[in-house]
C-alpha cells in the first residue's frame, strides 16, 4: 500500500465532477432521494394537498434530502480512509487516490450538510430534525462505531437509510399516519438482505479490513438465515398499506413472494456467491419497482 492509499494525501489540485460524485456516493444519493420523493409525493396525494402550489416545498425537500445524504457519504469516505485502501471496491475512491484530500472532503461534507439541513428546516421543523437524526445515525453511530465494532452493524445502519421517506412525508404533512411508518419499515427491512448480499460477495475483503460483517463473523449460512428473516418481515408489510389500494398490495406481495422464493433457494444452492449476486440484483429491482409503483398507483386513488 502506497502513501496515498494510507492517508489519502492530495496529489493533484484537479477536482472533477466524477471525483465529486464518487466522494458523495452518488448512487446512494439517487436512491435515497427517490425514497424521499416518494414519501413527499404520497403525503401530497393521500392528504389532498396541491402539488403545484407547493413547488418551494418540493424543491427544498428534494435538494435538501440529496445534500444531507451526499454529506453523509462524504463524511463516511473521510472516516473510512484507513480501510478503503484494503478493499478492492473502495480502493479507487478519490480520497484514496489522492484526487481529494481528507481536509477538502471534510469541508465538502460540512458545507453540503449545513446547506441541506437548512433547506429541510425551510419545509417543516420535523423534516429538519429528521435530517439531522439521519446524518447523526449514519456518520456517528454507524460509520464511527457500529461498522467497525458490531456484527449488527448492517441492521444499525439501516435506521439512517430508512429516514429519507420520513423526511419527504413530514416536509409536507407533519403528523403521523400508518403510511410513513410503513415506508420507514419497508426501507429498514429491505436494507439487511441487500447489504448482506454485498457482504457475502466481498467477504474476504471485509475480513481483511477488519470489518465484522455478518458473513465474516457468523458465516455465510447464518447470513442466509438472516436474509430470509428480513424478507419474511417484508412480506407482512403490504397488508398494512391498503391506503395505497389493492393493486399495490397485490404487486408488493408478488414481489415479496419472488424474493422469498429466491431466499429459500439459497439454502439449496452450492454457489453462494452467485446466489448473493442474484439477491443483490433482485433487491435493486424490488426497490425500484416498489417505489415507482407507489407513485404511479397513488395518482389513481
Curated annotation (Swiss-Prot):
PANTHER family tied to this protein: PROTOHEME IX FARNESYLTRANSFERASE, MITOCHONDRIAL
Top-level division of the source organism's lineage: Bacteria
Miscellaneous notes: Carbon 2 of the heme B porphyrin ring is defined according to the Fischer nomenclature.
Name recorded for this polypeptide: Protoheme IX farnesyltransferase
Swiss-Prot/TrEMBL GO biological process terms: heme O biosynthetic process
Gene Ontology MF: a single term: protoheme IX farnesyltransferase activity
Purpose: Converts heme B (protoheme IX) to heme O by substitution of the vinyl group on carbon 2 of heme B porphyrin ring with a hydroxyethyl farnesyl side group.
Family designation: Belongs to the UbiA prenyltransferase family. Protoheme IX farnesyltransferase subfamily.
Alphabetized NCBIfam families for the sequence: cyoE_ctaB
Keywords associated with the record: Cell membrane, Heme biosynthesis, Membrane, Transferase, Transmembrane, Transmembrane helix
Gene3D superfamilies found in the cross-reference section: UbiA prenyltransferase
Originating organism: Listeria innocua serovar 6a (strain ATCC BAA-680 / CLIP 11262)
Segments passing through the bilayer: 20-42, 55-75, 105-125, 126-146, 150-172, 176-198, 227-247, 249-269, 280-300
One GO CC term, this protein: plasma membrane
Catalysed reaction, written as an equation: heme b + (2E,6E)-farnesyl diphosphate + H2O = Fe(II)-heme o + diphosphate
Amino acid at each position: 500500500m502506497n502513501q496515498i492509499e494510507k492517508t489519502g494525501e492530495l496529489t493533484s489540485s484537479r477536482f472533477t465532477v466524477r471525483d465529486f460524485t464518487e466522494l458523495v456516493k452518488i448512487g446512494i444519493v439517487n436512491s435515497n432521494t427517490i425514497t424521499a420523493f416518494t414519501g413527499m409525493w404520497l403525503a401530497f396525494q393521500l392528504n389532498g394537498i396541491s402539488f403545484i402550489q407547493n413547488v418551494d416545498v418540493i424543491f427544498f425537500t428534494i435538494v435538501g434530502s440529496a445534500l444531507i445524504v451526499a454529506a453523509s457519504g462524504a463524511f463516511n469516505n473521510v472516516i473510512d480512509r484507513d480501510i478503503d485502501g484494503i478493499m478492492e471496491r473502495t480502493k479507487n475512491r478519490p480520497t484514496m487516490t489522492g484526487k481529494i484530500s481528507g481536509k477538502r472532503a471534510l469541508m465538502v461534507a460540512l458545507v453540503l450538510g449545513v446547506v441541506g439541513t437548512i433547506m429541510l428546516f425551510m419545509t417543516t421543523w420535523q423534516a429538519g430534525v429528521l435530517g439531522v437524526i439521519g446524518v447523526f445515525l449514519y456518520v456517528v453511530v454507524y460509520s464511527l462505531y457500529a461498522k467497525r465494532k458490531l456484527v449488527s452493524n448492517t441492521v444499525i445502519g439501516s435506521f439512517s437509510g430508512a429516514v429519507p421517506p420520513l423526511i419527504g412525508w413530514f416536509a409536507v404533512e407533519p403528523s403521523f399516519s400508518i403510511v410513513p411508518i410503513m415506508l420507514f419499515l419497508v426501507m429498514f427491512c429491505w436494507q439487511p438482505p441487500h447489504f448482506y448480499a454485498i457482504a457475502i460477495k466481498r467477504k474476504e475483503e471485509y475480513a481483511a479490513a477488519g470489518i465484522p460483517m455478518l458473513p465474516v463473523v457468523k458465516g455465510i449460512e447464518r447470513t442466509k438465515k438472516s436474509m430470509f428473516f428480513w424478507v419474511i418481515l417484508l412480506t407482512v408489510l403490504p397488508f398494512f398499506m391498503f391506503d395505497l389500494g389493492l393493486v399495490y398490495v397485490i404487486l408488493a406481495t408478488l414481489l415479496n413472494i419472488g424474493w422469498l422464493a429466491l431466499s429459500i433457494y439459497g439454502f439449496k444452492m452450492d454457489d453462494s456467491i452467485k446466489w448473493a449476486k442474484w439477491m443483490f440484483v433482485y433487491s435493486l429491482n424490488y426497490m425500484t419497482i416498489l417505489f415507482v409503483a407507489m407513485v404511479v398507483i397513488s395518482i389513481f386513488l
